[in-house]
């Protein structure tokens, strides 16, 4: 294994917990980049651009592999952000009731030695049950998903909202596609197993 410091360019506790599943040492740094979408920027382009920007903004002096990730939720062709408060969360979930939404998660690994970045993405579909306002309010009051795209925590009670999930890697839904990440790290000579 090459002697790289693994860096997660994120302050998200959810992404940190996901990376901890791999049982490899890493440090977390806060990325410094503008996350404003460009006018008419497609969701896939946005998440890949932001994943690269996050990874390259957290480069450190010693040889490192820096992981950047970004995610958006799309419903009816529109990007849905984090709700940030109770009323917005309720409204988002009401709009999603009975529908399928898609999560696009961009992933980048920046190699500070070669100055090269590999970038990719994964998608995940969430099909919601038909939910009434009372069910949604009870859920929001219990989990307070105010800082989660789509207004739910799939790793918690959010699972109660779903009819089915479609995707290759359930970690993608939480914000870090581990299957793709393992492939990218191995290409850089960083073995997990």
Curated annotation (Swiss-Prot):
List UniProt keywords, sorted A-Z: Cytoplasm, Hydrolase, Nucleotide metabolism
- Gene Ontology CC entries for this record: cytoplasm
InterPro entries cross-referenced by the UniProt entry: ITPase-like_fam (IPR029001), Maf-like (IPR003697)
GO MF annotation list:
nucleoside triphosphate diphosphatase activity
Q: What does the record give as the active site?
A: 70
Cross-referenced Pfam families, in alphabetical order?
Answer: Maf (PF02545)
Q: Which Gene3D superfamilies match?
A: 3.90.950.10
- Its protein name is 7-methyl-GTP pyrophosphatase
- Taxonomic source organism: Vibrio parahaemolyticus serotype O3:K6 (strain RIMD 2210633)
Q: Which NCBIfam families match?
A: maf
Protein's job: Nucleoside triphosphate pyrophosphatase that hydrolyzes 7-methyl-GTP (m(7)GTP). May have a dual role in cell division arrest and in preventing the incorporation of modified nucleotides into cellular nucleic acids.
Q: What class of enzyme is it?
A: hydrolase
Q: What is its main location?
A: cytoplasm
Residues marked Important for substrate specificity (site): 14, 71, 155
Family from the record: Belongs to the Maf family. YceF subfamily.
Top-down, what is the taxonomic lineage of the species of origin? Bacteria, Pseudomonadati, Pseudomonadota, Gammaproteobacteria, Vibrionales
Q: Reply yes or no: does the keyword Metal-binding apply.
A: no
Q: What are the EC numbers?
A: 3.6.1.-
Q: Provide the GO biological process annotations.
A: nucleotide metabolic process
Q: Which domain of life is it from?
A: Bacteria
Question: Where located?
Answer: Cytoplasm
What does it catalyze? N(7)-methyl-GTP + H2O = N(7)-methyl-GMP + diphosphate + H(+)
Coiled-coil-forming residues are none
Q: Which cofactor does it need?
A: a divalent metal cation
């Amino acid at each position: 294994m090459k002697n790289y410091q693994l860096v997660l360019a994120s302050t998200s506790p959810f992404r940190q917990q996901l990376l901890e599943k791999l049982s490899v040492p890493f440090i977390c740094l806060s990325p410094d980049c503008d996350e404003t979408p460009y006018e008419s920027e497609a969701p896939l382009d946005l998440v890949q651009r932001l994943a690269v920007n996050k990874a390259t903004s957290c480069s450190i002096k010693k040889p490192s592999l820096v992981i950047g990730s970004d995610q958006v939720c799309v419903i009816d062709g529109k990007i849905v952000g984090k709700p940030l408060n109770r009323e917005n969360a309720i409204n988002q979930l009401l709009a999603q009731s009975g529908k399928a939404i898609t999560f696009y998660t961009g992933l980048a690994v920046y190699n500070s030695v070669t100055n090269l970045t590999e970038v990719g993405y994964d998608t995940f579909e969430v099909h919601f049950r038909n939910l009434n306002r009372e069910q949604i309010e009870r859920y929001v009051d219990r989990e307070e998903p105010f800082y989660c795209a789509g207004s739910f925590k799939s790793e918690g009670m959010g699972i109660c909202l779903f009819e089915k999930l479609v995707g290759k890697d359930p970690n993608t839904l939480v914000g870090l596609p581990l299957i793709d990440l393992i492939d990218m790290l191995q290409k850089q000579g960083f073995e997990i197993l």
